Amino acid sequence: MAGVEEADKLKQLGNAAFSERKWHLAIDMYTKAIELTKTPTLFCNRALAELRAELPGAALADADAALGIEPTFAKAYYHKASAYLSLGKHKQALTNYKKVVDLAPQNSDAQAKVEFCKKEIRRINFENAIMTPDEAPLSQTIKLGSVRADYDGPRIENETVTVEFVEAMKEHFRLEKLIDRHDVIFILLEVQKILKKCPNFVSINVPVGEEITVCGDTHGQYYDLLNIFKLNGNPLETNRYLFNGDFVDRGSYSFENIMTLFAYKVLYPDHFFLSRGNHEGVSMNRMYGFEGEVTQKYNSEMFRLFTEVFNSLPIGHIINNEVFVVHGGLYSSDKVTLDDLQHPNRFRDIPESGLICESLWSDPQPMPGRAPSKRGVSCLSFGPDVTETFLNNNNLKLLVRSHEVKDEGYEIEHGGKCITVFSAPNYCDQMGNKGAFIRFTGGDMKPRFTTFTHVPHPGKRPMHYATGFGLF
């Protein structure tokens, strides 16, 4: 009986942490309660916290655990469906939302989710049906068109992206104004030409005494991107930047965010670098806002062109043959070499397994070895011994990755060999975290950290353009 009472106290602490949006603390409290007594409610509470913490794989496992105790527990099916939906797996989500409706016919939210999933499945099937394998890439057939007669914003002159244009474009975006379709397409086609020439993993040379800044996820938080440049200086040939993926989704200024980054890549192709993140892919863009945003601001054809450009992004970078920078992390095999990473075909949507998937989706863990990913994808989390082995085998000194919110904007793990950097402060307008970036100087290559807080942005809330939300 004492165990049950203690579990209830821990559950209440978990509920309190959840109400304060402290998802990981809530997970810890529910876990301690589950160690004392296993109930479907506790497993479902933890599943919901895991969904909020973007750990749908863990949420699926907890929903199944709840159903193992009580096979008709409707809330478990609901969380299971929500986890599948967050992964873009609409058919599996539909199956589980139907279970909820069967068990709770009056649940109007589940009924709405059933209809949403059916609609998305029809839409995706239609889009797949009209695409043919032999169809020429859109980048080869799209027309620039003429500039609108009533357009009075900044223009690309003489087919050249200049500093003056980029600065004017940034200010235009800051005022919530869009640039003409002609110039969007021009930038996308130009940046694609540059990216397609890159290997999967790009080597960056920073001369002795010069610097490079590494930023993590920015997730459509355009006004925070402007603040990074205010704090750290605009990109220049003498002020290098590397943005480590997840430029879009969630934040509702993803178009402005990615266009600014792409314009700088065109302006400084050898001094400004971009890595692909797990959100530079179709399934995430459909769920988390970028498709809806681009379609509303321009049209569906423009989104297709963005998708093609995303498929050209490099997977990672190596700075001065010392620092390995990739969005997610390391691999399911200790034998992976830098040469191995250059071989997979990256010019496609993000695969569900293999080296590219692992590069973009994996996470570090404190314990040695490997464990299944809590994100619900076919990759593993990796321990300090895995990091040590990879770095030693490839004559590297440090892993820098992103992909996870950190309260201080960064976290040093694995005995100083693994650093996570996240550059979207107050993520989704609710997490209260700081953002951070890292500066490295050629020569000593020791990381120096800058943290910063969020700045105000106009009225569009995160997920404004997303479909299927609130999911949970």
UniProtKB/Swiss-Prot annotation:
One of its GO terms (molecular function) is metal ion binding. InterPro entries: Calcineurin-like_PHP_ApaH (IPR004843), Metallo-depent_PP-like (IPR029052), PP5_C (IPR041753), PPP_dom (IPR013235), PPP_phosphatase (IPR051134), Ser/Thr-sp_prot-phosphatase (IPR006186), TPR-like_helical_dom_sf (IPR011990), TPR_rpt (IPR019734). The active site is at residue 279. Its cofactor is Mg(2+); Mn(2+). Keywords: Cytoplasm, Hydrolase, Manganese, Metal-binding, Nucleus, Protein phosphatase, Repeat, TPR repeat. Gene3D superfamilies: 3.60.21.10, Tetratricopeptide repeat domain. TPR repeats lie at residues 7-40, 41-73, 74-107. It is an enzyme of class 3 (hydrolase). Disulfide bonds: none annotated. Mn(2+) 2 binds at residues 246, 278, 327, 403. Activated by arachidonic acid. It catalyses: O-phospho-L-seryl-[protein] + H2O = L-seryl-[protein] + phosphate; O-phospho-L-threonyl-[protein] + H2O = L-threonyl-[protein] + phosphate. Binds 2 Mg(2+) or Mn(2+) cations per subunit. It comes from the Eukaryota. The TPR repeats mediate protein-protein interactions with substrate proteins, but also autoinhibit PPT1 phosphatase activity. May function as a protein phosphatase. PANTHER family: SERINE/THREONINE-PROTEIN PHOSPHATASE 5-RELATED, SERINE_THREONINE-PROTEIN PHOSPHATASE 5. This is Serine/threonine-protein phosphatase T. It comes from Trypanosoma brucei brucei (strain 927/4 GUTat10.1).
